[in-house]
């Protein structure tokens, strides 16, 4: 099964109580220690208070949102980078092999891969200011992918050939010097903070 299903399933087998669709909505901290958090059931609207001894903040692009429930002035440590992909007909990449374009005009790599009877083309690297539960590929990104892949595909391609598009968000570590997300570190950091919270941030 996919990792996001296998992980809670394995945790449950080891005695964890896995609460899906129950986002944290508040965190209580007194005396330099996180005492509890409040989670709300998205299906019923009911909230519950959970007492805590230790919190692991492994929330990807929502890392800073959780940290600011503890301290509204906590500095940002994560940048959101959007990666978008398009799906084309299989005829644009006949055969069973994928293809890697080593350098695009923005200095990234681009890939074309056979995928479930289609051809997947990706990816972009665009900074997104705020996390989004349902990120979308922009027309600018779709045009970039088409223009970059056009010289390598088996036949001419146009916007009308795009069967679908999708996007995801990367939680990249924020560097003091800034710069483009394409050049941002793909490393991760493990940060003990707020007395009894461990934040795992970054990675890809």
Per-segment meaning from a language model:
Residues 57-72:
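Flavin (primarily FAD) binding-site architecture
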Residues 18-20, 57, 121, 199-200:
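General beta-strand structural signal in soluble alpha/beta enzymes
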Residues 2, 6, 10, 68-204:
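C-terminal catalytic lobe of FAD-dependent flavoproteins
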Residues 45, 62-63, 94, 127:
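Glycine-rich nucleotide phosphate-binding loop and flanking beta-alpha elements
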Residues 25, 35, 64, 84, ...:
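Glycine-centered loop/turn positions within well-structured domains
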Residues 1-54:
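Helical element adjacent to the flavin cofactor pocket in flavoenzyme catalytic cores
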Residues 50-60, 149:
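Short hydrophobic core segments
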């Amino acid at each position: 099964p996919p990792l996001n299903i296998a992980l809670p399933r394995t945790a449950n087998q080891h005695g964890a109580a896995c609460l899906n669709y129950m986002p944290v909505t508040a965190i209580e901290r007194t005396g330099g220690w996180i005492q509890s958090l409040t989670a709300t059931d998205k299906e019923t609207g009911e909230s519950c208070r959970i007492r805590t001894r230790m919190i692991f903040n492994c929330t990807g692009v929502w890392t800073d949102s959780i940290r600011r429930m503890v301290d509204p002035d906590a500095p940002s440590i994560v940048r959101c980078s959007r990666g978008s992909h398009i799906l084309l007909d299989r005829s644009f990449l006949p055969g069973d092999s994928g293809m890697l374009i080593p350098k695009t005009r923005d200095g990234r790599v681009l890939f074309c891969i056979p995928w479930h009877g289609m051809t997947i083309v990706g990816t972009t690297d665009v900074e997104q200011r705020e996390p989004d539960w349902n990120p979308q590929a922009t027309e600018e990104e779709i045009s970039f992918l088409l223009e970059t892949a056009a010289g390598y595909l088996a036949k001419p391609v146009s916007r009308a050939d795009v069967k679908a598009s999708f996007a995801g968000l990367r939680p990249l570590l924020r560097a003091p010097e800034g710069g483009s997300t394409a050049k941002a570190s793909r490393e991760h950091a493990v940060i003990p903070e707020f007395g009894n919270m461990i934040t795992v941030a970054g990675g890809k």
